[in-house]
Amino acid sequence: MVFCGDGGLSCESIDFALCCLRGRSGNYVQSRILPMADASPDPSKPDTLVLIDGHALAFRSYFALPPLNNSKGEMTHAIVGFMKLLLRLARQKSNQVIVVFDPPVKTFRHEQYEGYKSGRAQTPEDLPGQINRIRALVDALGFPRLEEPGYEADDVIASLTRMAEGKGYEVRIVTSDRDAYQLLDEHVKVIANDFSLIGPAQVEEKYGVTVRQWVDYRALTGDASDNIPGAKGIGPKTAAKLLQEYGTLEKVYEAAHAGTLKPDGTRKKLLDSEENVKFSHDLSCMVTDLPLDIEFGVRRLPDNPLVTEDLLTELELHSLRPMILGLNGPEQDGHAPDDLLEREHAQTPEEDEAAALPAFSAPELAEWQTPAEGAVWGYVLSREDDLTAALLAAATFEDGVARPAPVSEPDEWAQAEAPENLFGELLPSDKPLTKKEQKALEKAQKDAEKARAKLREQFPATVDEAEFVGQRTVTAAAAKALAAHLSVRGTVVEPGDDPLLYAYLLDPANTNMPVVAKRYLDREWPADAPTRAAITGHLLRELPPLLDDARRKMYDEMEKPLSGVLGRMEVRGVQVDSDFLQTLSIQAGVRLADLESQIHEYAGEEFHIRSPKQLETVLYDKLELASSKKTKLTGQRSTAVSALEPLRDAHPIIPLVLEFRELDKLRGTYLDPIPNLVNPHTGRLHTTFAQTAVATGRLSSLNPNLQNIPIRSELGREIRKGFIAEDGFTLIAADYSQIELRLLAHIADDPLMQQAFVEGADIHRRTAAQVLGLDEATVDANQRRAAKTVNFGVLYGMSAHRLSNDLGIPYAEAATFIEIYFATYPGIRRYINHTLDFGRTHGYVETLYGRRRYVPGLSSRNRVQREAEERLAYNMPIQGTAADIMKLAMVQLDPQLDAIGARMLLQVHDELLIEAPLDKAEQVAALTKKVMENVVQLKVPLAVEVGTGPNWFDTK
């Protein structure tokens, strides 16, 4: 009896199919033909193939970790769990990792059996989006990713396994699908959830069958999760007993047909289910000979650091950065391929210079010289955007020599050392251990190792800050982070020269050191401090000559001194009224419950309002509202704010849903997290300012992101009441008024717009009057609102369609308004045209101070892409110059405020928040206004609105 034949797919043969590899664009494309490695593995190359079942690991991570979302509400816990395991496995140099996903189409098993996998629970609604993010990160990091149309990930993994075994590789499979047990042998093992390895012995011990019998066993028992029927009434114990007695499924059925199989009840069940068993056998049998084009011995394909950084920033997965950096550093463990799976943490490396500098040979280092200023620091923080992070390593580099700073082990490590007699009672000297005693010993040893690993994670070995005593500045990559870390612990230093700031001025796409090191030195950014110091020193010699005079001046007078200002702001933090925010959260919760009740009443049913899918069904199917747009990712009818706003008046449920979403986001992003982010030692909130994250030169902030606290909603404004002044102080808010419009008037050199600002007119009322041909006194609120919308929207390429939607006016009326607007202010149109011409000719646009942004998309043949780049191009000189002006004002203000006992706390958009002694409030307010308004002289005056109050809200 042949169970894989008769029209079914054989485990040993299958029609050839094309292997498809997911392209960087996200579309399926035929894979590149990669050279096959025919020889045995090179000792210098990976010798272990790690195959990850992508969907299985994503599901495992989703349910293993508590829900986690970023500030935008996007769930990320499956992404975090998946990537941490992937990076952990990939860090070991002996491993080549390949990720395999199920295709988004049905496979041949679905065609054979309509009910295949129909018994599985519905996929959580927020998981597919996370899986797509995982795909994008895997691609960006350069890990091979395979998806084979018509076949499951299991089949691809099975085929890769047999290919790898034929070339002498060890294979480790990360999957929760027990079908993989049919692949196991002495060289192929499955990595279990607890990182133990499952091989033939473990399968036989647990299930009572050999791996060669596994498909027969599954054919008898079936698989409820895949809706594979098996033999009705035959359970695992009976199936194992039958195979132990008869050896194979074929022999079992020979005995059943001959009448020799006992008991009769079992024989009858087998014969009644014979067709189902045959069918189950076919479904369980993996395909092992797919013609996959993959190169063995290559750890990673070319990666894309820019895409990786964009994804990490967008998803706010900052904890993954050190692990990603570690991909290119020294491996943590030895060459034994299973070490990493059996140990939670790496051994501490020896602290000699040769071991500390794996990326460079000694002769090469000797040729590298540091800048004239002297020693350059390299360092490793456990987290680079958190002042509570631990300084894990530091080193200096000078004249070709790297010297690691000594690391001190915390006292807590002693708690992890096992007493000498811990295993004494398990090791009697007069007789060998029993099996039970051996297991108890192994468990105790593993528990002790886990305890050591956990304590080393909670209390890592760190650099003694005394190493930095006597330093006035620290020259390093991302020097602000190191200076802030030291200063908050009492060793006050200033950030010195920083290659990241040089690189950021050369091209704002240079947002982090992995990108910079690769781009300018063709080096990977290492995980160890000595090599980081060496690369930093070399970059500080290579990058400055690349700057022109304008950007060199920006470095010396703006970015470098600002780095110190921002570091001090981070160390100071801002005081937060946690009780107030918690009360506000409770009130928001009450309102959310009320909104939920009203929404359900209008819907006529209860549903999960936070679920886009369920909300889509209620709004567009049940209530039959008109859908205005579809999502790019899934093609579903959109429930985003931009899609619901035009429907606000179409049904009373819409404004309730919009309010629910806003309240829910504010509560989850600010009200609940902020009190937990307050430093228990200082009692203040310490955000981190990102100086090199935004292409226009603007600052951004992390942990928390204070740039996105809304000010238009009532609750958004209320949140600002939670930011308070210290006792004896008051808060002062200084906000540039309409700075981008004023800069537009200056740069576009439009006389009519300049005149309005010089005369101190209401620019929006003046615009409405001039465009509509009215007297300013007769302009009503709606007309002024239309003019305001166009004034601000023109910098972002506002179309007539957008204006029509925003104002609720006919398209023709909106188009006419924009046409007359440009006729009224012809300098604006000239500015746009000139900027685009300049960008096409030079490849970049720039601010008044010379900050550049490169705009290659201006020559794109894709109209949508080109028009988006055009909007970016003529917006950047305005927005970027506004950012430059704010930075200069901060640099000038900082020492003057310090001299009178005041201090800058926050910078948000065009606003500064300052804390001043109560008796100096008027003096500080006047000083701030004067400095900010006179930091640069334009053809129109800069205007700064200043207010004081006990909290941020009351400064307005």
From Swiss-Prot:
GO terms for biological process, alphabetical: DNA-templated DNA replication; double-strand break repair
Deleted gene: phenotype: Increased sensitivity to ionizing radiation (IR), lag time before DNA synthesis/repair commences increases considerably, decreased rates of both DNA synthesis and DNA repair following IR. If combined with a temperature-senstitive mutation in dnaE (catalytic subunit of Pol III) viability at 37 degrees is dramatically reduced.
Assigned EC number: 2.7.7.7
Pfam families per UniProt: 5_3_exonuc, 5_3_exonuc_N, DNA_pol_A, Taq-exonuc
Family annotation (SMART domains): 53EXOc, HhH2, POLAc
5'-3' exonuclease domain segment(s): 209-296
Keywords: DNA damage, DNA repair, DNA replication, DNA-binding, DNA-directed DNA polymerase, Exonuclease, Hydrolase, Nuclease, Nucleotidyltransferase, Transferase
Protein's UniProt keywords contain Ion transport: no
Reaction catalyzed: DNA(n) + a 2'-deoxyribonucleoside 5'-triphosphate = DNA(n+1) + diphosphate
SUPFAM superfamilies in UniProt: 5' to 3' exonuclease, C-terminal subdomain (SSF47807), DNA/RNA polymerases (SSF56672), PIN domain-like (SSF88723), Ribonuclease H-like (SSF53098)
UniProt cross-references to InterPro entries, sorted A to Z: 5-3_exonucl_a-hlix_arch_N, 5-3_exonuclease, 5-3_exonuclease_C_sf, DNA-dir_DNA_pol_A_CS, DNA-dir_DNA_pol_A_palm_dom, DNA/RNA_pol_sf, DNA_polI_H3TH, DNA_polymerase_1
Molecular functions (GO terms): 5'-3' exonuclease activity; DNA binding; DNA-directed DNA polymerase activity; nucleoside binding
Family, similarity comment: Belongs to the DNA polymerase type-A family.
Description of how the protein assembles with itself and partners: Single-chain monomer with multiple functions.
Function, as annotated: A DNA polymerase, required for DNA repair after DNA damage induced by ionizing radiation (IR); this is not the major DNA polymerase. Following severe irradiation (7 kGy of gamma irradiation) genomic DNA is fragmented. DNA is progressively degraded for the first 1.5 hours after IR, in a step promoted by RecA and counterbalanced by DNA Pol I and Pol III, followed by massive DNA synthesis and genome reassembly in the next hour. Optimal priming of DNA synthesis requires both RecA and RadA, Pol III initiates DNA synthesis while both Pol I and Pol III are required for its continuation.
Protein name, entry field: DNA polymerase I
Source organism per UniProt: Deinococcus radiodurans (strain ATCC 13939 / DSM 20539 / JCM 16871 / CCUG 27074 / LMG 4051 / NBRC 15346 / NCIMB 9279 / VKM B-1422 / R1)
